[in-house]
Amino acid sequence: LRVVVQPCNKRVFMDAQYENAGATLSDDLTQCSVILGVKQVREDDLLPDRTYVFFSHVIKGQPENMSLLDTICKKNVRLIDYECITENGKRGDPRLIAFGIFAGNAGMINILRGLGERMLALGYSNPFLNVPSSYMHPSLNAARFSVRDAGEEISKGGIPQDFSPLTVVFTGNGNVSKGAQDIFSLLPHEMVSVEDLPHLPENQSKIYGCVVEAEDMLERLDSSKPFSTR
């Protein structure tokens, strides 16, 4: 089995490691019959009559990707979508491949860093400036220490008053949300309900968190029937 890997300097594994494992490094995939990726492929880059494996984001009928689905059909591409790989091979069964806890970890770390830079741009010094971006940390444990340090600064000196009460809202309780909540929990915080949001007191020494579920964002046209996501 010949394996071709496209060169990239953004992966956790170096190109040389793939070569040492027996892979061939090349940007040319025309000799490959099966092509694996993660995110959706640009339409112009799809090679005809191949099998592609990636997250296409079309299974729910996402309108922004219907053009991609049309191109897949026109180019006679066999699409294997990670999202459709389930425990028993049936739609609705538990998925076997999905973005996980680490995606939420990395995203929350980057959000804190971005929040710090935004506050600074508005003229406010703040504890989040001491949280480097995810890629700058040598390990997840190192990132946790950075977030804890920022949390200690919040406990002692608080966040800028103009941003209080600072609230982080998590949509849903999937893997990514749980990963984000995991990092958030390292800060001095209080979890509140959706009903509490309009009445939160100003408190500079902690951050509020709220998990928002589908029933908090949607309502049935017929209010006499109980809410259901199905």
Located regions from the model:
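Glycine-rich phosphate/diphosphate-binding loop of Rossmann-like nucleotide-binding domains
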Residues: 1-8, 123-230
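An N-terminal-biased, well-structured beta-alpha scaffold segment characteristic
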Residues: 1-71
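Conserved active-site and cofactor/substrate-binding residues in soluble primary-metabolism enzymes
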Residues: 13, 30, 63, 67, ...
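Short, solvent-exposed polar/charged micro-motifs at secondary-structure junctions
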Residues: 15, 34-37, 90-93, 218-222
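A short helix-to-beta-strand connector/capping loop
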Residues: 18-23, 75-77, 203-207
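Generic secondary-structure signature for well-ordered alpha-helical cores
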Residues: 23, 34, 74-78, 112-121, ...
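Conserved beta-strand scaffold positions in the cores of enzyme catalytic domains, especially
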Residues: 25, 52, 79-81, 206-211
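Glycine/serine-rich phosphate-binding loop and adjoining beta1-alpha1 elements at the start
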Residues: 43, 47-166
